[in-house]
Amino acid sequence: MSATIISGNFIASKLREELKQRIRILSETWMQPGLAVILAGDNPASSVYVRNKARTCGELGIHSKVFNFSADTPQKIILRQIQDLNANPEIHGILVQLPLPSHIQMNEVIAAIAIEKDVDGFHPCNVGALATGHALFRPCTPFGVMKMLAEYGIPLQGQHAVVVGRSNIVGKPMALMLLEQGATVTICTSQTRELASHTRSADIIVMATGKANLLTSDMIRTGATVIDVGINRLADGQLCGDVEFSGVKEKAGYITPVPGGVGPMTITMLMNNTIEAAEHAKAKAQIEARCGSMQ
């Protein structure tokens, strides 16, 4: 048995064609969607991620602008930039590339973003709203995973899902989204004792630990769906996920590859959230215009 490969590249390409149509409508009837990215420090991986996001914006027709800050930039300067972007009507989404330099308080910076422009879904209000099923924007990586599961018709209602990872970016929101769809969710970490005893009972496993090849074929049941969010670089320069792909794919029912799995979906859902933010802004502007004309 060999697993069906869940291609993030394929699903992302399909979704991006739909996004282009929404962007075209916005651009023709109102204005071009705009995304601002704040990059602080000189983390090479962050620079690559930001370039990829800016390139995707250009390919789809979203206006983007990157604001680069040196690693020693005071936090107040970054907060001032966010305030300016909050007030800029041509910017509909604001993204702060993580991680930030150690002297900057991430929570304070994220909380400074206007909720209606929080396209990463990390603002405390959006995080709280996600717990009640009413988030304005959903965090992009778990949102992308949910789209992948839906595209391949993988059932969630009543299924046992194990999420390995507890980050605010992936693990926690992933668990909430699976719960929302009726799954029974177990949350583990890379330090969970007897991790295999949990993963072997799972219908769906989401790996998000940053530990290369942590999940092996003896840790899953036959036919399980395995989603690999991890991306790690080995000593020889090769990329791999948190899943030992070659072995696990012979036992799983569905599996995502690394690269070409979850990664393309994360960026695509960021684009989706930016477009939604622009659509919300357009609707608000139209309502305000109608109200103004009635006075």
Curated annotation (Swiss-Prot):
The keyword Transit peptide does not apply. Its EC number is 1.5.1.5, 3.5.4.9. It catalyses: (6R)-5,10-methylene-5,6,7,8-tetrahydrofolate + NADP(+) = (6R)-5,10-methenyltetrahydrofolate + NADPH; (6R)-5,10-methenyltetrahydrofolate + H2O = (6R)-10-formyltetrahydrofolate + H(+). One of its GO terms (cellular component) is cytosol. It comes from the Bacteria. PROSITE patterns: THF_DHG_CYH_2. GO terms for biological process: L-histidine biosynthetic process; methionine biosynthetic process; purine nucleotide biosynthetic process; tetrahydrofolate interconversion. Pathway: One-carbon metabolism; tetrahydrofolate interconversion. Keywords: Amino-acid biosynthesis, Histidine biosynthesis, Hydrolase, Methionine biosynthesis, Multifunctional enzyme, NADP, One-carbon metabolism, Oxidoreductase, Purine biosynthesis. NADP(+) binds at G165, R166, S167, S190, I231. Pfam families: THF_DHG_CYH, THF_DHG_CYH_C. InterPro entries: Aminoacid_DH-like_N_sf, NAD(P)-bd_dom_sf, THF_DH/CycHdrlase, THF_DH/CycHdrlase_cat_dom, THF_DH/CycHdrlase_CS, THF_DH/CycHdrlase_NAD-bd_dom. GO terms for molecular function: methenyltetrahydrofolate cyclohydrolase activity; methylenetetrahydrofolate dehydrogenase (NADP+) activity. PANTHER family: C-1-TETRAHYDROFOLATE SYNTHASE, CYTOPLASMIC, C-1-TETRAHYDROFOLATE SYNTHASE, CYTOPLASMIC-RELATED. Catalyzes the oxidation of 5,10-methylenetetrahydrofolate to 5,10-methenyltetrahydrofolate and then the hydrolysis of 5,10-methenyltetrahydrofolate to 10-formyltetrahydrofolate. Belongs to the tetrahydrofolate dehydrogenase/cyclohydrolase family. Homodimer. This is Bifunctional protein FolD. The gene is folD.
